[in-house]
Amino acid sequence: MANVVVVGSQWGDEGKGKIVDWLSERADVIVRYQGGHNAGHTLVIDGVSYKLSLLPSGLVRGKLSVIGNGVVVDPHHFVAEVEKLRGQGIDVTPDVLRVAENAPLILSIHRELDAMREGSNSGLKIGTTKRGIGPAYEDKVGRRAIRVIDLTEPETLRPKVERLLAHHNSLRRGMGLEEIAVETILTELTSVADQILPYIDQVWRVLDERRKAGARILFEGAQGALLDNDHGTYPFVTSSNTVAGQAAAGSGLGPTAIGYVLGITKAYTTRVGEGPFPTELNDEIGEFLGTKGHEFGVVTGRKRRCGWFDAVIVRQTVRTSGINGIALTKLDVLDGLEEIKICVAYKLDGKRIDYLPSSMGAQARVKPIYETLPGWSETTAGARSWNDLPAQAVKYVRHIEELIGAPVAMLSTSPEREDTILVTDPFHD
């Protein structure tokens, strides 16, 4: 049985929540391996909506759910999200939820620093959620982070906090902010320790044992591959690696355990926040896609930018993430359009190119080269087989497969999990 990594193939918001929920019914273990509570997703089960941003989707189905070491954990948000799920009737206990003991913590100083930087009139606005994700990763790389396991050792926690604040207070002085006392952070941590410590574990061992026992493991990615810190539209990216390779590093399970990479791909393109977007539509078609597709962020409520499908960036993600097949989502949003365009290449300084360049200036200058396909007037909403789809919709899907170099393994035609056409089961070897 193959273990499956789910990765967004664009800039996030591709509809991973529904697909992960669909797959989680077939999985035994669900793992979050990167990011924090900055990327949300909505699950709709029996008419009830569950909005998650930190906890793995498998909790809603009672499956063992793991927060890996690649995730930065806001302990107060963790507690709040657990309580919210319990309020919706979901049983959340250490039997079904584990947190990597070596996961770094997000603290109030990270949130304040994030907001201060993003709100500054000087410098480059990245479009962060101001939830402290980036500064927490900075401290991890700088080897001064407070990790979950540190909450179990009060005798070593104080010197670690002192070292952390030596760095942060120097930053705060430069920004004209009041310095933070060691006791303030210690109180912040000890106030929540008893609520998070029952869930901690050496998750790499848990996952290795489950793998050897034949469990199906689903790795749940957040955001999208074009927000990857290395392979995305830098600097308009997130602070972690979002490509499929991070599933191994962010969970402690070796890369040979990964059997199938599923790229979640929207039938058009959206982006939240700043950064290049070659196929963006600032016209009535863009408004149509945003309105019909309900394109507003789960976490921030921010309106998403919308545009035509960009085969260049998805083809690039297929390569950088080793995608075996895609789950194409929101095809129904395109219903009713007379014609549909697909970006097949870019023009950069008069030259045709088939990739997204790495430099910020070049990314801003690329112009899309489009192919135009006829649309369809019939509905695709709720389709559960290829025979239910209009002929032109099938042609659109097949053309996407050709352009990106990967087959459609799943096709989603509404937010409801049953409205899914399965072509290839990712869990089958």
Curated annotation (Swiss-Prot):
Binding site for IMP: 13-16, 38-41, 129, 143, 223, 238, 302
Compartmental location: Cytoplasm
Cited PROSITE patterns: ADENYLOSUCCIN_SYN_1, ADENYLOSUCCIN_SYN_2
InterPro entries given in the database record: Adenylosuccin_syn_GTP-bd (IPR018220), Adenylosuccin_syn_Lys_AS (IPR033128), Adenylosuccinate_synth_dom1 (IPR042109), Adenylosuccinate_synth_dom2 (IPR042110), Adenylosuccinate_synth_dom3 (IPR042111), Adenylosuccinate_synthetase (IPR001114), P-loop_NTPase (IPR027417)
Cofactor binding, per record: Binds 1 Mg(2+) ion per subunit.
Record-level Gene Ontology MF annotations: adenylosuccinate synthase activity; GTP binding; magnesium ion binding
CC terms in the record's Gene Ontology section: cytoplasm
Catalyses which reaction(s): IMP + L-aspartate + GTP = N(6)-(1,2-dicarboxyethyl)-AMP + GDP + phosphate + 2 H(+)
Active site positions: 13, 41
Keyword Transmembrane: no
Pfam families: Adenylsucc_synt
Domain of life per record: Bacteria
Binding site for Mg(2+): 13, 40
UniProt-annotated binding residues for GTP: 12-18, 40-42, 304, 330-332, 412-414
Enzyme class: ligase
UniProt keyword annotations, A-Z: Cytoplasm, GTP-binding, Ligase, Magnesium, Metal-binding, Nucleotide-binding, Purine biosynthesis
Chain sites annotated for binding substrate: 298-304
The protein's annotated pathway: Purine metabolism; AMP biosynthesis via de novo pathway; AMP from IMP: step 1/2
Family label: Belongs to the adenylosuccinate synthetase family.
Stated role: Plays an important role in the de novo pathway of purine nucleotide biosynthesis. Catalyzes the first committed step in the biosynthesis of AMP from IMP.
Record's subunit section: Homodimer.
NCBIfam families, A to Z: PRK01117.1, purA
Protein name, as recorded: Adenylosuccinate synthetase
Gene name of the record: purA
